[in-house]
């Protein structure tokens, strides 16, 4: 695999194709303004013809009064490649473009402290945009001295100081709902201590978590005001109790009660967790607080009274009282062991015919939720498939996105006769687990147990696999488990996020990932496979696809990335024999064979014979042996173009590599290589 070359090309391409228009000027009327006032934003210096269009669209987001970005950028903007028509700016007679709106109405939020804007083409792909610009909200300046983070955890016996400074004389009113808890009049400074429920001091106590709002009203003009919001989470008391039966991480179904499920989350170094979903109206209270299992310190939760024919979803809100520097106090994530998710980022671009009746992402929520679809069952026609022998495999590799115009599993089902006429006996699917965005090769995975909905439903993939098995065709799945991308809950629960924008790489306390990659071919965030939690996660991924989807084999992508012995700049180390990854990957093969004795285990290693022999000859006397990806592109292509130089194909024979049996997957083409026929037509030896 040559993804480092591809990445270089992409970076190079972006620098050439970028169409950012830098020399623009922004203005707003009135100025200054409050968030509840109608405003008119104008930009000058934009030439949409440079983007091959006549129209300009506003893309906007906002920050709360504590300068924390709170927008999902979904509800009003549309998609980056398809802005909503409602965001089109008006072209003025002087060549400027304007847009009028009331911030509180557009964003459906009170207490806006800053608004970010840029102008763009309807399809902003290729950086058809202007740089970011920001407008401060409010007719006077407020400085929040404390708390510096929002939300903030209030210790039960402790206190939090709310301290604010204004440039004007202000009347301050501290609200809980509609109730004024405290007021301070004709002051520039505001200060009030909020006490925990078990505090021994007298004063303003909070018994439960709540949002306090501070109304800051100009003494000379009551129409000139600003709101500050403080989300105060009173430290709850988690109940320590054993679950009714042994749970695995993720969703657990109660075999004796179909209306009940149990959740388990392993979150080391986290203090308490809430489960929020459509079954409890996303309410954070003691009823949504997860229990703690005293025997393993894992969080668990019971959800009951579920209707078999209704869809449900949930999200974890994970809290840390003392996070490492740069890490958030709270983060909202879906379950890392999700089998399906709903996403605020991608779902509105998924075609209805690919995934019918996909639930609409819940309003006023952000991020991703685990989707519980209890009615999604499949009755297999072939329950025990007699796989082709390893040495007889003829594999056809497919990127579902590009196979047919609709980019769906249904396309594959409709072409079964085409596959049969090719006389292949195996199909290898490039990654179909949940990846970031909808247009991808799939190697930017974020949820390895979750199916990406862009290609179709869970049952459609199962139908395709079942149909292949009925026609003697095995199905192999490409698996990228050396890394993950930033939406993964395994990253986000322990991430480095100093700018508090809810995105970042692994922090130094993340139990799953290296902060710096331990090999030279890394993309995304590098798994530490010597950690037991990572090994558990990997085995759960293997188990899921074998047991639930009857996948016949895995092509393990970039197995050079499964070492802890090197660093991201040492090519010699990465490409040399590493005992830790030899042993580790053997253990993963053993686990696969424990679930399916005839499972195909294929490594894309492209390394030295000494290392590949360890795997190819492993348990070969039992009929096992790991199959090695064997690139022969240049040699085969030299022959197909009619050249003698560099046309020796002897290494296509397993014996040339020291393998005791036929465990070499020789190929002339793959997704990483140029098409042979293209070179045949353009560079053939035709004197």
Region locations from a protein language model:
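Bacterial Sec-dependent N-terminal signal peptides
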Residues: 1-22
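Substrate-binding/active-site clefts of carbohydrate-active enzymes
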Residues: 376-550, 558-577, 587-594
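Exposed beta-strand face motif in extracellular beta-rich ectodomains
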Residues: 111-117, 208-214, 310-314
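Short, compositionally biased P/S/T/A/G/V-rich stretches that sit at domain boundaries
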Residues: 19-34, 136-155, 239
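Conserved structural position at the C-terminal beta-strand
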Residues: 119-121, 216-218, 318
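Basic K/R-rich, polyanion-interacting modules in nucleoproteins and related proteins
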Residues: 231-273, 330-392
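Active-site-proximal helices and loops of the catalytic beta/alpha 8
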Residues: 433-434, 441-444, 558-667
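Aromatic-rich carbohydrate-binding modules that target alpha-glucans
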Residues: 55-108, 179-195, 200, 255, ...
């Amino acid at each position: 695999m040559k993804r480092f070359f591809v990445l270089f090309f992409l970076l190079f391409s972006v620098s050439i194709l970028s169409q950012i228009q830098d020399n623009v000027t922004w203005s707003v009327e009135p100025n200054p303004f409050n968030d509840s006032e109608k405003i008119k934003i104008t930009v000058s210096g934009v030439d949409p013809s440079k983007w091959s269009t006549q129209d300009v669209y506003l893309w906007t987001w906002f920050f709360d009064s504590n300068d924390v970005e709170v927008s999902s950028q979904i509800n009003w903007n549309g998609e980056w490649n398809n802005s909503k028509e409602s965001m089109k700016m008006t072209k003025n007679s002087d060549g400027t473009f304007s847009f009028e709106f009331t911030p509180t109405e557009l964003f459906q939020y009170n207490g806006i402290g800053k608004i970010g804007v840029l102008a763009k083409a309807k399809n902003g792909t290729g950086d058809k945009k202007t740089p970011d610009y920001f407008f401060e909200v409010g007719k006077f300046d407020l400085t929040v001295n404390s708390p510096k983070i929002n939300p903030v955890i209030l210790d039960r016996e402790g206190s939090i100081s709310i301290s604010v400074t204004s440039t004007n004389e202000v009347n301050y009113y501290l609200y809980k709902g509609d109730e004024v808890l405290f007021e301070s009049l004709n002051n520039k400074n505001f200060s009030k201590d909020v006490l925990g429920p078990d505090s021994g001091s007298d004063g303003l106590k909070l018994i439960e978590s709540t949002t306090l709002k501070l109304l800051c009203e100009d003494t000379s003009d009551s129409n000139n005001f600003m709101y500050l919001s403080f989300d105060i989470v009173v430290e709850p008391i988690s109940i320590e109790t054993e679950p009714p039966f042994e749970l695995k991480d993720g969703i657990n179904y109660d075999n004796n009660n179909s209306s009940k499920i149990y959740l388990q989350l392993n979150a080391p170094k986290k203090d308490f967790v809430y489960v929020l979903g459509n079954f409890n109206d996303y309410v954070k209270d003691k009823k949504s607080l997860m229990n703690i299992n005293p025997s393993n310190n894992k969080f668990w939760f019971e959800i009951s009274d579920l209707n078999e024919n209704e869809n449900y979803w949930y999200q974890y809100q994970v809290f840390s009282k003392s996070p490492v520097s740069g890490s958030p106090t709270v983060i909202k994530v879906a379950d890392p062991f999700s089998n399906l998710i709903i996403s605020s980022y991608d779902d509105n671009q998924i075609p209805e015919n690919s995934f019918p009746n996909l639930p609409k992402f819940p309003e006023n929520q952000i991020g991703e939720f685990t989707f519980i679809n209890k009615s999604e069952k499949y009755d297999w026609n072939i329950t025990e498939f007699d796989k082709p022998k390893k040495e007889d495999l003829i594999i056809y590799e497919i990127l579902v996105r590009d196979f047919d115009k609709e980019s769906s599993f249904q396309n594959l089902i409709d072409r079964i006769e085409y596959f049969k006429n090719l006389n292949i006996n195996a199909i290898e699917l490039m990654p179909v687990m949940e990846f970031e965005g909808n247009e991808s090769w799939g190697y930017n995975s974020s949820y390895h147990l979750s199916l990406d909905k862009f290609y179709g439903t869970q049952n459609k993939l199962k139908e395709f696999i079942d149909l292949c098995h009925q026609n003697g065709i095995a199905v192999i799945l490409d698996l990228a488990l050396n890394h993950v991308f930033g939406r993964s809950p395994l990253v986000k629960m322990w991430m480095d996020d100093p700018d508090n924008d809810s995105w970042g790489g692994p922090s130094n306390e993340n139990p799953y990932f290296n902060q710096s990659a331990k090999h030279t071919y890394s993309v995304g965030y590098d798994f530490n496979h010597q950690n037991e939690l990572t090994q558990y996660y990997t085995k759960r991924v293997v188990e899921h696809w074998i047991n639930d989807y009857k996948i016949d084999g895995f092509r393990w992508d970039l197995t050079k990335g499964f070492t802890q012995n090197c660093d991201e700049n040492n090519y010699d180390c990465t490409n040399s024999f590493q005992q830790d990854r030899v042993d580790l990957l053997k253990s993963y093969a053993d686990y696969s064979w424990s679930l399916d004795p005839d499972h195909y285990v294929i490594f894309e290693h492209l390394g030295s014979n000494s290392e590949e022999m360890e795997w190819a000859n492993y348990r070969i006397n039992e009929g096992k042996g790991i199959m090695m990806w064997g690139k022969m592109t240049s040699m085969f292509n030299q022959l197909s173009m009619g050249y003698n130089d560099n046309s020796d194909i002897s290494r296509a024979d397993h014996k040339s590599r020291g393998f005791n049996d036929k465990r070499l997957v020789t190929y002339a083409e793959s997704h990483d290589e140029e098409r042979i026929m293209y070179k045949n037509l353009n560079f053939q030896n035709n004197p």
